[in-house]
């Protein structure tokens, strides 16, 4: 199962929270992070400290992120604070499952509090990712379609 997260590598995006959540998830979960920033060294250190180097890929900055949205099973935003949540809207417009922390305007973008968890709670984040990934195929398709429709109406 492929988890995608896109955003600058900064304290605000709280990647350590997402990495800690990944520790709670089964081995089959892999994480790809797209973005560059001043917290890259901290993120790399955290990956090594948690022994996640086989499960996490840092891809740096990438121009066309849409193909990555389409390739992932779920998009996760683990921010402590956030503005509008544009990348969440992009993921939803690509018909992806989305789980996000309740930071800034993200909850409004997602539009369904069932997919929102409190900030800085890796256990709840992991539980929600697992819950959504365990949906049956039909439910996943329904949610992904609804995500796209919701964003297109914004």
Task: Locate the predicted segments by residue.
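A short alpha->beta transition loop at the rim of the catalytic pocket in nucleotide-sugar-dependent
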Residues: 66, 73, 95
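Aromatic "clamp/platform" in nucleotide-sugar-dependent glycosyltransferases that forms part
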Residues: 61, 80
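Conserved acidic donor-binding segment of nucleotide-sugar-dependent glycosyltransferases
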Residues: 114-123, 131-137
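A conserved mid-protein helix/loop that constitutes part of the nucleotide-sugar donor-binding site
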Residues: 1-24, 38-44, 123
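A charged, aromatic-enriched C-terminal amphipathic alpha-helix characteristic of glycosyltransferases
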Residues: 137-154
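Short hydrophobic beta-strand element within catalytic cores of glycosyltransferases
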Residues: 97-100
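Nucleotide-activated donor-binding/catalytic signature segment of Leloir-type glycosyltransferases, i.e.
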Residues: 44-60
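Short acidic/histidine- and often glycine-rich active-site loop of Leloir-type glycosyltransferases
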Residues: 89-90, 103-116
């Amino acid at each position: 199962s492929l988890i995608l997260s896109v955003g600058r590598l900064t304290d605000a995006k709280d990647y350590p929270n997402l990495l800690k959540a990944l520790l709670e998830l089964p081995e089959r979960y892999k994480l790809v992070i797209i973005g560059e920033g001043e917290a890259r060294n901290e993120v790399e250190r955290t990956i090594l400290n948690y022994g996640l180097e086989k499960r996490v890929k840092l891809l740096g900055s990438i121009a066309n992120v849409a193909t990555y949205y389409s390739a992932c099973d779920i998009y996760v935003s683990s921010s402590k604070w956030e503005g509008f949540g544009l990348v969440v809207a992009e993921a939803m417009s690509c018909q992806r499952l989305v789980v996000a922390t309740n930071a800034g305007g993200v909850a409004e973008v997602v539009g369904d509090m069932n997919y929102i968890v409190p900030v800085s709670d890796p256990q709840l984040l992991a539980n929600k990712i697992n819950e959504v990934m365990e949906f049956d195929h039909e439910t996943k398709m329904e949610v992904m379609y609804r995500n796209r429709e919701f964003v297109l109406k914004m």
